[in-house]
Swiss-Prot record:
It comes from Hydrophis schistosus. InterPro entries: PLipase_A2, PLipase_A2_Asp_AS, PLipase_A2_dom, PLipase_A2_dom_sf, PLipase_A2_His_AS. The active site is at residues 48, 93. This is Basic phospholipase A2. Binds 1 Ca(2+) ion.
Length: 119
């Protein structure tokens, strides 16, 4: 679920950045999404949106499903997740969080005018 996703993000970046920093970033981080991602970090969000979309096509509810994950020294990983939907959502969240941690955060892409820049 979205609360767990925020913890997974914090785990992946080792507490260097709040998950809230990603809630209104670029064209795809946060609610909705359209146009071309503004950078690699925004592309991570588009991939995550697409991953949730695939989960929904499989009959899953990614924004509400709970899953078991572990935050280790190498970052988050899904743990003992046997149900198909829960596993899919956990995999989506961990992949996105790791993608966030790998890519630079550009403050200029926070809270952008999506009507102008996301066409």
């Amino acid at each position: 679920n979205l609360v767990q996703f925020s913890y997974v993000i914090t785990c992946a970046n080792h507490n260097r950045r709040s998950s809230l920093d990603y809630a209104d970033y670029g064209c795809y981080c946060g609610a909705g999404g359209s146009g071309t991602p503004v950078d690699e970090l925004d592309r991570c969000c588009k991939i995550h949106d697409d991953c949730y979309g695939e989960a929904e096509k499989q009959g899953c509810y990614p924004k509400m499903l709970m899953y078991d994950y572990y935050c280790g020294s190498n970052g988050p990983y899904c743990r003992n997740v046997k149900k198909k939907c829960n596993r899919k959502v956990c995999d989506c969240d961990v992949a996105a969080a790791e993608c966030f941690a790998r890519n630079a955060y550009n403050n200029a892409n926070y809270n952008i005018d999506t009507k102008k820049r996301c066409k």
